[in-house]
């Protein structure tokens, strides 16, 4: 018995009696005479496949356009974030510079502030002492 990959047992099909590779109405296959090639025949009655293919081409075109728009939006967002990051780095450098200047200014004039606070406290205690003496009589 010759070996045919599409037949098994008593001449029955592996596909339960259906022609192999049959996917929908209007499509049928048959083996070419004496070869392993398969011929596909489309019934003219079911010619809506061309319309479906055209519709699929349209959907593919739409998906391609959407993918391109997503790519351009991603590039725009990446450029925006890069620019924002550079602005943030410049702002951080400016803040660090100003804090450094402020710290140096505090260190230079810090002793005078402490002296002023001490003198103010002594003055307040002196005024309170004098006031308490005046109203004690």
Swiss-Prot record:
Q: Name one GO cellular component term.
A: endoplasmic reticulum membrane
Domain t-SNARE coiled-coil homology span(s) in chain numbering: 43-105
* Record keyword Cell wall biogenesis/degradation present: no
Residue intervals annotated with topology Cytoplasmic = 1-113
Q: How does it sit in the membrane?
A: Single-pass type IV membrane protein
Quick one: where is this thing mainly located?
A: Golgi
Protein name, per record: Bet1-like protein At4g14600
Q: Which organism is it from?
A: Arabidopsis thaliana
